[in-house]
């Protein structure tokens, strides 16, 4: 594989990384739970996003419960929502940094097609930060508020794949002569 093709492939990987990060950031399925309450046939599941939670009632996705609104109330029952809101806000900020770093890496690689260590470093940093964002969100997200059967949702997996693509793109760019 020639060096030019490797560079374009690396740029494509970073573009895919950024697309998945944006899709993951604005999606509503970072955590999912099917079969909320076995005693109530109307509740079918829930989806937790970075900034809100959705509950499926009678097969329809209900109105979102925004963490910031629930956190603003003085009711102690909503206190775990403050942790979820903080985790979502922190993760969103990290993902915006990933988008900025990845965009700068793409711009530098197109303006200066020569192999530079700065572009490789920026591409790798975008991938590592995308993975770190998922890890930060998972550790900050309140674990006691939701049931044990909750699993990572599609948007969390997309962000993980985005991080892997960012790291692989940096490696591919480094290998180009």
What feature does the model see in each segment?
Residues 26-86, 141-150:
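Long, glycine/tryptophan/cysteine-rich extracytoplasmic
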Residues 148-161:
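Individual transmembrane alpha-helices with interfacial aromatic-anchor signatures
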């Amino acid at each position: 594989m020639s060096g030019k093709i490797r560079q374009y492939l690396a740029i494509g990987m970073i573009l895919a990384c950024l697309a998945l990060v944006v899709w993951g950031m604005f999606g509503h399925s970072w955590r999912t739970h099917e079969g909320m309450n076995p005693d109530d046939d109307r509740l079918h599941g829930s989806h937790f996003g970075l900034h809100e939670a959705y509950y499926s009632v009678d097969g329809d996705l209900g109105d979102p419960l925004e963490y910031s609104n629930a956190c603003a109330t003085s009711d102690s029952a909503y206190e775990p929502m403050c942790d979820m809101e903080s985790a979502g806000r922190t993760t969103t900020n990290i993902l915006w940094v990933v988008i900025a770093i990845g965009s700068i890496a793409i711009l530098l690689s197109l303006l200066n097609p020569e192999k530079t260590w700065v572009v490789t470093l920026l591409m790798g940093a975008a991938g590592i930060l995308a993975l770190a964002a998922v890890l930060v969100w998972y550790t900050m997200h309140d674990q006691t508020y939701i049931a044990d059967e909750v699993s990572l949702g599609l948007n969390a997996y997309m962000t993980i794949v985005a991080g892997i693509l960012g790291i692989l793109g940096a490696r591919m760019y480094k290998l180009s002569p």
